[in-house]
């Protein structure tokens, strides 16, 4: 590495978050700029560790030591080339990936790990600023047509890879804007949407076609795809939310996280014609309300940060699992993803966070509005036995359910295509990402279940390679004119 003793001399640093009182007044990303000199210093902490275990934690197999060293030496343009060799969208992972690579960093065995996520974001943002990221259209078209259903990170990664390989690619998105969960599920304070838009401009210039308001299996018949395309990739995500089936669930004021978060993202986009904007009874807002968020994961934290910015009266976040340890648990030794307490920016902003809480029932008023949540403290998993005498009640006006996702929505497209499902309810695939129907492939959360943005990109790239092999197995295409898919 460029500085053999960097990990001994330089401490881990991260960008500071903007002051809570400032960032709660807007929807912009929460981190302050990080000076270039410090970015390079963080790259110097990457050790000459022999076997870089950071690779084992990275689903896209990023060449992490390579671009850490290039960043340290100020070779930013070379760094973005190495970064793009494995990751189509480092600006997404550099913002919303939890960085399992850092959990697997060798330095992290007994010191704070290398700031890999920070360096990744620094490299790609420098590349955008300098104009080093540009369209890469194919030199030759294959004449093959591919439909991609879903425009989240898996669908976008596959679409870009397939187009660069010379195939004609059309992406179908049920919403009115491209981006999937990144567009409508991730709050702006974590991912401002211009970050998505600039990458879409590159993809359009490469020749990818996007069709919005196209819900395949609902307002677009599946035959429109099966009759027209040589291959179809399903990348519609795992959108079926886990419900809380307790008495009182039918009361007004109880909503899934993915009903709440998209509304605010649409407000941030400046939408004017949504039903919830013209009819206040359809709006899900936390302003002046006593809010409870059920679920302690990333989606719950997104609901928490969004709630804070809407000025609630109070907010509680409850999780049925016990409080994680402050440091890596013995049950998840290095280089595994550690079980440990994580504090997001949203938690820093306020609210009460509590663990080992099970919800028993909701009660409401005479108008059918939720007014109370009855809970009990429980013991450890797997039994979660209620602790006698620990029952308590909380007054509430708004409840947000953020308890994860059960898999893809089966009705509509999946049922109409007659696709087989696995034992978890996800779309089943054989070797090479092909489903039970010839020529139809699946990738991302639709195939593997609820997961991370970095896994989605990995799935999209691998599915693209499988589709490319399927389409060109017997095709007369000169290989020297085609971009290899890896």
Question: Regions from the language model: what does each represent?
Answer:
Residues 30-31, 35, 127-146, 265-289:
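A short, basic/flexible loop-to-alpha-helix module at the beginning of a structural domain
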Residues 250-288, 381-450:
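FAD-site-proximal beta/loop scaffold in flavoenzymes
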């Amino acid at each position: 590495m460029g500085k053999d003793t960097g990990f001994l001399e330089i401490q881990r640093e991260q960008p500071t978050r903007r002051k809570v009182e400032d960032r709660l007044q807007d929807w912009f990303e929460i981190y302050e700029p990080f000076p270039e000199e410090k970015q390079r210093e963080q790259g110097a902490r990457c050790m000459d560790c022999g076997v870089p275990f950071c690779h084992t934690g990275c689903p896209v197999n990023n060449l992490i030591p390579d671009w850490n060293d290039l960043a340290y030496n100020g070779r930013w343009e070379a760094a973005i080339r190495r970064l793009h060799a494995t990751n189509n969208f480092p600006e997404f992972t550099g913002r919303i990936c939890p960085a399992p690579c850092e959990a697997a960093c060798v330095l992290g065995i007994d010191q704070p790990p290398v700031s890999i996520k920070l360096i990744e974001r620094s490299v790609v943002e420098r590349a955008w600023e300098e104009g080093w990221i540009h369209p890469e259209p194919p030199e030759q078209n294959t004449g093959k047509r591919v439909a991609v259903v879903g425009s989240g990170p898996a669908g976008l990664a596959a679409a870009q890879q397939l187009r660069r390989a010379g195939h004609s690619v059309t992406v179908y998105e049920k919403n009115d804007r491209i981006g999937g969960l990144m567009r409508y599920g991730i709050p702006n304070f974590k991912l401002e949407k211009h970050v998505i838009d600039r990458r879409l401009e590159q993809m359009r210039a490469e020749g990818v076609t996007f069709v919005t308001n196209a819900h395949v299996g609902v307002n677009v018949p599946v035959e429109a795809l099966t009759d027209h395309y040589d291959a179809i990739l399903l990348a519609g995500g795992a959108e079926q939310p886990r419900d809380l089936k307790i008495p009182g669930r039918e009361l007004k004021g109880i909503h899934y996280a993915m009903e709440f978060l998209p509304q605010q993202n649409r407000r941030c986009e400046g939408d004017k014609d949504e039903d919830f904007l013209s009819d206040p009874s359809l709006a899900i807002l936390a302003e002046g309300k006593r809010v409870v968020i059920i679920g302690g994961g990333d989606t719950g934290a997104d609901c928490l940060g969004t709630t804070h910015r809407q000025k609630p009266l109070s907010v509680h976040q409850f999780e049925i699992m016990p409080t994680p340890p402050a440091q890596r648990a013995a049950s998840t030794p290095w280089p595994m993803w550690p079980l440990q307490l994580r504090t997001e920016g949203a938690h820093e902003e306020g609210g009460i966070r509590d663990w080992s809480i099970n919800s028993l029932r909701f009660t409401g008023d005479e108008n059918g509005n939720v007014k109370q949540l009855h809970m009990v403290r429980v013991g450890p998993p797997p039994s979660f036995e209620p602790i006698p005498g620990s029952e308590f009640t909380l007054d509430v006006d708004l409840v947000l359910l953020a308890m994860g996702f059960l898999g893809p929505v089966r009705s509509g497209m999946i049922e109409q295509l007659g696709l087989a499902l696995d034992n978890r309810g996800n779309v089943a695939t054989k070797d090479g990402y092909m489903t039970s129907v010839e020529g139809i492939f699946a990738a991302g959360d639709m195939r593997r279940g609820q997961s991370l943005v970095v896994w989605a990109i990995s799935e999209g790239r691998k599915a693209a390679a499988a589709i490319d092999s399927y389409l060109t197995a017997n095709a007369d295409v000169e290989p020297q004119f085609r971009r290899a898919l890896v």
